Amino acid sequence: MDHKKTWHEKLYCHLGQYFLIEKMLYKKKTPHHQVMIFKNSVFGKIMVIDDIVQTTERDEFIYHEMLTHVPIIAHGSIKSVLIIGGGDGGILREVCRYKMIENITMVEIDVNIIDLCKKYFPNHSNQAYQDSRLNLIIDDGLNFIKRTKEKFDLIISDSTDPIGCGKNLFRSEFYFNCKNHLEENGIFVAQNGVFFLQKNETILTYKNLKKYFYDTRFYQANVPTYYGGVMVFAWGTNNIEYRKNSLEKIQIRIKNTKLDFNYYNAKIHISSFYLPQYILNELNES
């Protein structure tokens, strides 16, 4: 065992993961979160918020690509996007790659997270905060979605886990307001954790989303940082045709973007909606 200091994640009571700290870069409390940033030889820089790993340099692309490109490519003509959370800038970076998108609104509760990630994780945002299409708002996501008059083609909820101020972004009230601020054929997506270890959170999301969307599903990705199996993303829309897109149609849309990806591709897009049977069983029983 290396004699360097180790840090143990405190997401679960009876099991977890640890990281060797090569170098501590930052450790302070903001008005909203306890934040720690350190270097690790495997994952590079790691950001921890409230004792839970949020993002790493090494594998952030998987999470950010899947939460962004699956709904954008499925829809085909996104013009306006609302990002709730996402202070590390990764979702914003991916959204900004699309020239067809005209307006981007981002609502982040903690400006300190944005500033820290600009400093320690500059490749996450990759200058996206300078994009002229961006309207950056520092506010609680639920507060914003309740009072805004705008509607969006796509709403992406890139939140922390449902603890502390992140709880607001997992409530039925939040999903209701998101649905009301989507255009007629809009899509809502959100991170929903690792199903094998966070089953109850996913089932609660499923029950709440079903109240407001005709098509409520989850899709999946394997993100090494998020311990415990496949990670699931919530999907809500009133247009059931999006998930019926053929492989050929998805391939054409991706080709037309002229974008390169590190994880996402047409076959990943289609297959991500095919969930393991143990997840389907639990969702069907709920």
UniProtKB/Swiss-Prot annotation:
What does the record give as the reaction this protein catalyses?
S-adenosyl 3-(methylsulfanyl)propylamine + putrescine = S-methyl-5'-thioadenosine + spermidine + H(+)
Q: What does UniProt list as catalytic?
A: 158 (proton acceptor)
Which residues make up the binding site for S-methyl-5'-thioadenosine? 108, 140-141
Question: Taking every annotated instance into account, which residue ranges of this chain make up the domain PABS?
Answer: 5-238
Q: Which Gene3D superfamilies match?
A: Spermidine synthase, tetramerisation domain, Vaccinia Virus protein VP39
Q: Any idea where this protein resides?
A: Cytoplasm
Q: Does the keyword Transferase apply?
A: yes
Report the record's Gene Ontology biological process terms.
spermidine biosynthetic process
Give the enzyme class. transferase
What GO molecular-function term can you cite, just one?
A: spermidine synthase activity
- What Gene Ontology cellular-component terms does the record carry? cytosol
Which parts of the sequence bind spermidine? 64, 88, 158-161
**InterPro entries named among the record's database cross-references:** PABS (IPR030374), PABS_CS (IPR030373), SAM-dependent_MTases_sf (IPR029063), Spermi_synthase (IPR001045), Spermidine_synt_N (IPR035246), Spermidine_synt_N_sf (IPR037163)
The metabolic or biological pathway listed in the UniProt record of this protein is: Amine and polyamine biosynthesis; spermidine biosynthesis; spermidine from putrescine: step 1/1
E.C. number, please? 2.5.1.16
Identify the main location. Answer: cytoplasm
| Keyword annotations from UniProtKB, A to Z | Cytoplasm, Polyamine biosynthesis, Spermidine biosynthesis, Transferase
Query: Which family is this sequence assigned to?
Result: Belongs to the spermidine/spermine synthase family.
Q: How does it assemble?
A: Homodimer or homotetramer.
User: What role does it play?
Assistant: Catalyzes the irreversible transfer of a propylamine group from the amino donor S-adenosylmethioninamine (decarboxy-AdoMet) to putrescine (1,4-diaminobutane) to yield spermidine.
Protein name as catalogued: Polyamine aminopropyltransferase
